[in-house]
Regions:
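Binuclear metal-ion centers of metallo-dependent hydrolases, dominated by the metallo-beta-lactamase
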Residues: 242-249
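Charged helix-capping and loop-helix junction motifs
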Residues: 218-224
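A cross-domain feature marking catalytic cores of carbohydrate-active enzymes
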Residues: 60, 205, 241
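Alpha-helical elements of the RecA-like P-loop NTPase motor core of helicases
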Residues: 44, 68, 87, 192, ...
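Conserved beta-strand signature within the Rossmann-like core of class I S-adenosyl-L-methionine
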Residues: 235-240
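SAM-dependent nucleic-acid methyltransferase catalytic core
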Residues: 2-41, 49, 93-202, 206-213, ...
Length: 249
């Protein structure tokens, strides 16, 4: 088992050394899923560090920013414990045109945002997906926890245009996901189920000290359990964290 601990500074330094790698020339799709701690800007850096593999697994899928920008693997697995996120992805797969039409018809409005954010999400999977994505794209802080967030607004960038552009990008995003297995599992079960000598795991867990921004109720003990599990796997793993005394330990 090979376990790489990567922080932002190390990733950037290593990326400069590996820019000649062929995989860096792959032009992927930018995920429209806004996500706290997402790796949109570090995706190419992380991709450049990946070893050759047959099965690619993201136990903490989140916004899928690395998955969608990398060259497809023979087997790909996206997993997340967030039921609303997974419901949106599955709805996008099964009802793409209807979902996009519903989202395109919505206006960027503080009134709509405040009304929907104060209400429970609908029980119907389709309506739930529509509202969830609208709130995610208009939320100031794109967290998936119970923490409240204000409405995105500003004078430099049009939030309305940004939202509509994201809906357009969902079409290519859905096409990229067609070859991906989408799971709703605890990260431990996901790792154990897909572990093999040909598997590469991208491990992007909740950050230490920022656990409240994510679902799952992570604690210091959870981080330790993840480290213990990764020491036992047959495959390879790349772990992303910010520097912290607990992680250094």
């Amino acid at each position: 088992m090979t376990n790489l601990l990567l922080n932002k500074k190390e990733a950037l330094n290593t990326f400069e050394e590996l820019t000649e790698s062929p995989i860096n020339r792959v032009k992927g799709i930018h995920s429209p899923i806004r996500w706290f701690g997402g790796k949109y800007y570090l995706a190419k850096d992380l991709i450049s560090l990946m070893p050759k593999h047959h099965c690619y697994v993201e136990p903490f899928g989140g916004g899928g920013h690395v998955l969608t920008q990398k060259e497809p693997s023979k087997v790909e697995v996206y997993n997340d414990i967030d039921r609303n996120l997974v419901n949106f992805l599955l709805t996008l797969r099964s009802s793409r045109e209807e979902l996009l039409a519903s989202l395109e018809s919505l206006h960027t409005s503080r009134e709509i945002y405040n009304m929907w954010s104060s209400q429970p999400l609908p029980e119907d999977p389709f309506e739930r997906a529509v509202r969830w994505y609208y709130l995610l794209r208009h939320r100031l802080i794109p967290n998936n926890s119970e923490l409240k967030s204000g409405f995105r607004s500003g004078t430099e960038k049009s939030v309305a245009e940004d939202f509509q552009n994201s809906v357009v990008r969902l079409q290519q995003f859905e096409k990229r996901l067609r070859r991906v297995n989408i799971e709703l599992l605890d990260y431990k079960e996901c790792i154990r189920r897909y572990d093999s000598e040909k598997t590469f795991f991208l491990i992007d867990p909740p950050y230490v000290g920022r656990e409240a921004m994510y679902q799952g109720g992570w604690t210091e003990q959870t981080h330790r359990e993840l480290a213990s599990l990764l020491r036992t796997i047959k495959g390879k793993a790349l772990v992303t964290y910010y520097p912290d005394p607990l992680i250094d330990e």
